[in-house]
């Protein structure tokens, strides 16, 4: 249910009115209060899942939700205070539940603590809201649900964009020019640790690789990999960064962040992806967070090694994907110590790079094709599973 209409569309709940809302909601979540359109509506349309939209000035249907899309969870904001009083009356009476939809993977325990405190301030039962999170730990929490948002997000960017099928790399049998692809647009210290070590050890000579200089305020003291355990690594890493940015394509900075833009040769001319995920430990939550970075490799016919949260491969298996366990060492995924997981992942990489890349790719081919087909398929069942969890 929504408070406002915009032509024939609902206007996102709690969002300030844009200068030209009749054109597009693009960029809505980029500024305070970081409210964004609820992506679920787009996904329901993409995959033909039934979704009834109504407004708070109409009769409230049974089991109705009031969706609030979050581009970023801001702990300084009292989200409940932003809800119109007439809508809040329905929530207080139990006729309507708030549904926070958050596609990011930061710590959901902290978000629950904040929202439960706000419930107490406003005299609301904690059962007045549900929270959808991109962090897998959400499934272990009361009133929280995990949803693989980025799988469906990249589907609508990589499979079918604005009603048109998108190009993608194929699992061809021809020799390829590079062993692997490893891309990083945004600088984070843990990513710099990994890529600089590849660089120092001469592992990038047969790779498509990049390391950008876009910064988001990441602090070296927050690096989840303990640099003190590697003599001289920090100084060599800083030297590596001073030579950047490093590029492997001709795309602009804007195109690098446009998920429907594909430099196809980075996948069709290399054998696998070493994925530098968005988060490495998901704010000590114990959960995993999988983004389009991983799904881009899957869609474009690449097997993968993932530098990311523990449990990332396990989550992919739970989603139905194959993680090439018969063809490379994937035991790193179960290691919770961030530094040890980094060491074990590097060991798996080095073992893989000793193999005949072409022969190894052919061994993986059936699983590559299986994963690609699974990703391209309808996500109706994903949405149905989410609806089922929210109805409990």
Give the label of every model feature segment.
Residues 1-275, 281-291, 295-392:
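Pol beta-like nucleotidyltransferase catalytic core
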């Amino acid at each position: 249910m929504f408070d406002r209409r915009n032509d024939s569309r609902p206007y996102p709940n709690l969002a300030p009115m844009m200068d030209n809302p009749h054109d597009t909601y693009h960029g809505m979540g980029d500024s305070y209060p970081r409210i964004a359109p609820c992506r679920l509506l787009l996904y329901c349309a993409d995959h033909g899942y039934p979704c009834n939209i109504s407004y708070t000035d109409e009769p409230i249907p049974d089991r109705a939700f009031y969706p609030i899309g979050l581009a970023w969870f801001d702990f300084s904001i009292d989200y409940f205070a932003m809800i119109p009083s007439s809508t809040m009356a329905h929530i207080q009476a139990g006729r309507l539940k708030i549904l926070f939809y958050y596609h990011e993977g930061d710590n959901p325990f902290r978000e629950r603590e904040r929202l439960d405190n706000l419930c107490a301030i406003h005299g609301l039962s904690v059962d007045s809201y549900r929270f959808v999170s991109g962090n897998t730990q959400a499934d272990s929490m009361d009133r929280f649900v995990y949803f693989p948002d980025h799988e469906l997000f990249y589907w609508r960017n990589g499979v079918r964009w604005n009603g048109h099928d998108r190009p993608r790399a194929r699992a061809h049998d021809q020799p390829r020019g590079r062993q692997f692809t490893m891309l990083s647009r945004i600088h984070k210290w843990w990513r710099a640790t990994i890529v600089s070590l590849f660089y120092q050890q001469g592992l990038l000579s047969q790779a498509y690789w990049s390391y950008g200089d876009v910064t988001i305020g990441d602090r070296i003291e927050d690096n989840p990999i303990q640099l003190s355990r590697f003599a001289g690594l920090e100084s060599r890493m800083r030297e590596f960064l001073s030579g950047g940015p490093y590029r492997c394509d001709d795309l602009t900075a804007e195109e690098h962040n446009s998920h429907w833009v594909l430099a196809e040769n980075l996948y069709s001319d290399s054998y696998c992806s070493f994925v530098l995920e968005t988060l490495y430990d998901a704010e000590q939550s114990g959960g995993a967070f999988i983004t389009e970075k991983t799904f881009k490799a899957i869609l474009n016919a690449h097997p993968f090694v993932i530098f990311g949260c523990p449990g990332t491969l396990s989550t992919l298996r739970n989603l139905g994907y194959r993680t090439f366990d018969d063809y490379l060492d994937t035991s790193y995924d179960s290691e919770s110590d961030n530094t040890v997981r980094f060491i074990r992942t590097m060991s798996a990489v080095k073992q893989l790079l000793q193999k005949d890349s072409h022969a190894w790719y052919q061994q993986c081919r059936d699983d590559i094709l299986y994963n690609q087909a699974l990703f391209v398929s309808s996500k109706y069942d994903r949405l149905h599973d989410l609806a089922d969890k929210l109805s409990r």
